[in-house]
Amino acid sequence: MIKGINHITYSVSNIAKSIEFYRDILGADILVEGETSAYFNLGGIWLALNEEKNIPRSEIKYSYTHIAFTISDNDFEDWYIWLKENEVNILEGRDRDIRDKKSIYFTDLDGHKLELHTGSLEDRLSYYKEAKPHMNFYI
């Protein structure tokens, strides 16, 4: 039986710059740092970065694949300003209903998509039950 997410690993092109991004911009606690790898605690998630310099990264921008982190609604504007001030690549978000709460989509230095989201799974399911009658719900 799967008990939960163990860790998330991202391949990065420059470990030193990526450490700065996750530590200084997102506030991750660095746990381990090596020549080509680093481990963080980011909101209770074990995040691993491994440097792989010579792999193609150009197609990643076309994918919706991302990791979303929970933030409070009260912190939403502060996060947006913080990311802008630090010249983080903020992406145009998708159109969303107010019941779907708020999100900021952005990328790390290698184009991995990240999201800061004010809603919860319960919020999303409540909204979808109202707005998407074609969906089947099992909870």
Swiss-Prot record:
InterPro entries in the cross-refs: Fosfomycin_Res_Enzymes, Glyas_Bleomycin-R_OHBP_Dase, Glyas_Fos-R_dOase_dom, Metallothiol_Trafse_FosB, VOC
Domain VOC residues, every copy: 4-119
Gene transcribed to yield this protein: fosB
UniProt-listed Enzyme Commission number(s): 2.5.1.-
Residues annotated for Mg(2+) binding in this entry: 7, 66, 115
Function, as annotated: Metallothiol transferase which confers resistance to fosfomycin by catalyzing the addition of a thiol cofactor to fosfomycin. L-cysteine is probably the physiological thiol donor.
Taxonomic placement: Bacteria, Bacillati, Bacillota, Bacilli, Bacillales
The name this protein goes by in its record: Metallothiol transferase FosB
Cofactor field: Mg(2+)
Location(s), subcellular: Cytoplasm
PANTHER family: FOSFOMYCIN RESISTANCE PROTEIN FOSX (PTHR36113:SF6), LYASE, PUTATIVE-RELATED-RELATED (PTHR36113)
NCBIfam families, per the entry: Fos_BSH, Fos_BSH_Saur, PRK04101.1
